[in-house]
Structure formats: structure tokens, C-alpha cells
């Protein structure tokens, strides 16, 4: 791809704004600011031990998870980049117990930004791909946000995306008009369009799940995975491969490129906790992206984006990816009711 013919993220968004007329200028600017923050996070991640940002920070987030130094730094980068631009009413993050209203000394906009600043951070110290996930909603109360302002189903998202900090740094985005992938050109500092209209194959022979939890699974999940593992001699009549990175952004990015199903089910260890992944800033944005790429995403019993949130840090079971496999495992849950 010649430099002269490259489409940068800024150019892509401006063209979308002109062609479809459904990408408001404030939303375009917000996406560009988030992408710029992801560049800064990528830079800090890539420094590794040289940047004195590896290891734990000696604190826990609202979920009781030990925070890594890069968790906190990435959260601060996203807050600092977005608080002053005038596009947001408030932000919410995995790393903060409550929402962050835009300070009174800055102009406020009509959007809400929800994010997981560094997904897969347990992999930081071993140099496995990690990333940032974000979701954008309109503030129903204008520019004066409350916690309830965020509690909208995923169908209300106006944009969602993620960045993967791996061998290449990529930024995947949807505004409800397909899914596109941009790769960071570090020499010039630009996001360059490298994949357009990404599509997930309807069928797959790959699945992603943490098999070490198999003894805790409920029957529908156990039935589904047992059938996959039975291979050609089993009821599916085909061989399946398991892939598990323990980094949602990396697993979903693989599925977006070559198909597969990602599963993080609820299990019997904590019957009162419906799953581990957070609805607002993990499941919803990833579901929006996957559906826009022709895939499906459910909790096992309902479409993820139709779940009505009850809290910023609500958890849900997640089954997403290739449409026919998601349909099958969801059907097994229906049969077990």
C-alpha cells in the first residue's frame, strides 16, 4: 500500500460523515481522541520493563482484582485525553467504582464513554497481547450525567471498538455501519485502514474457553464442549481446535479474522454471580462489533445487547462469534430450561 493511497482513521471518519450523514462531528472527534489515547497506551505497553510500569500497583479495583501499574496508567491516559474536549458528559471505567463526570471547568458534550482501559492485564508481564475496549452512548439527560444515564442496553451504543497491543497495534471500530480495522504506523504516528467490512464466517471449527473450569460448568456448556472434543467420531462429525489466550481482545480479534466462538460462561463456583465479564465495557462493545461483522452474541439465554443493565459493573455470561455455533450453544441452554 503506497503512502499516498493510504486511508487514515481521520480521513475514513470524515468520509463516513460526508457519505452517510449519520456520524456527528462530536462523535467523530471523540473517536479520534480515544484512538489517540490508545496510541499513548500502546507506547507505554511497548516499553515493558524499560518503562518501570510492569508489576502490580499494590491496590485493587472495584471488583477486588489486583491492579497492575499499567491498568492505572492506561486509565489515567484515557481520562486525561477525553475530559477536556467538550464531547463528553461523563466517563466510566473498570478501574473506577463510580462514574467520572466531566469537570465543571471544561465544556460538556452529549456522549458517555465507558471503557476497560487494559483488558487482559494479567498477561502484561509475560508479553502476551492485551488491549483497550470502549463503548459510546448518548447521555439521555443531555449534558448532566448520573450513574443511571449509563444504564442503557447495548442496542443504544453509537460506537464501540477495541485496540490490541500485540505484534502490531490495531484499532477496530464500528459506528453501526460495519467493522473496520486500522493498524498503527509507528513511523508517522497514524492509524491506517488495513481491513474493511470485516466479516465473521457463520461456521467454524475453533472455540475459545478456559477448559480448566470444566468441572464447574453447567450442563449446556459441558454438553456443547464435550461434543466439540469428541471430534469426527462424535455427534458433530468434525474435528475442532481450542484456542485460549486469556485476553478477550486477542481472542475476539482472532475470531473476527478467521471465525470461532468465544465463551466465558457462568459456573457453579459462584451461582449468585452471572458470569465474570462486565456487561457495560466488555460484553456490550464486543457484541456490537461481532454483530456488525455478521456474528452473534448471547448470554446463553438472551441477546447480550438487549440486557437491561442494573449497575456499571454488572457481569454477564458471554457466548459470541460465528453465528451458527452461538445459535447451537444458546439452543442447548434453551433446552435445559
UniProtKB/Swiss-Prot annotation:
GO terms for molecular function: fructose 1,6-bisphosphate 1-phosphatase activity; magnesium ion binding. InterPro entries: FBPase_C_dom (IPR044015), FBPase_class-1 (IPR000146), FBPase_N (IPR033391), FBPtase (IPR028343). Mg(2+) 1 binds at residues 94, 116, 118. The keyword Metal-binding applies. Keywords: Carbohydrate metabolism, Cytoplasm, Hydrolase, Magnesium, Metal-binding. It comes from the Bacteria. It comes from Burkholderia cenocepacia (strain HI2424). Mg(2+) 2 binds at residues 116, 119, 282. Its main location: cytoplasm. GO terms for cellular component: cytosol. NCBIfam families: PRK09293.1-1 (NF006778), PRK09293.1-3 (NF006779), PRK09293.1-4 (NF006780). Its EC number is 3.1.3.11. Pathway: Carbohydrate biosynthesis; gluconeogenesis. The keyword Ribonucleoprotein does not apply. Belongs to the FBPase class 1 family. It is found in: Cytoplasm. Its cofactor is Mg(2+). Substrate binds at residues 119-122, 210, 276. This is Fructose-1,6-bisphosphatase class 1. It catalyses: beta-D-fructose 1,6-bisphosphate + H2O = beta-D-fructose 6-phosphate + phosphate. Signal peptide: none annotated.
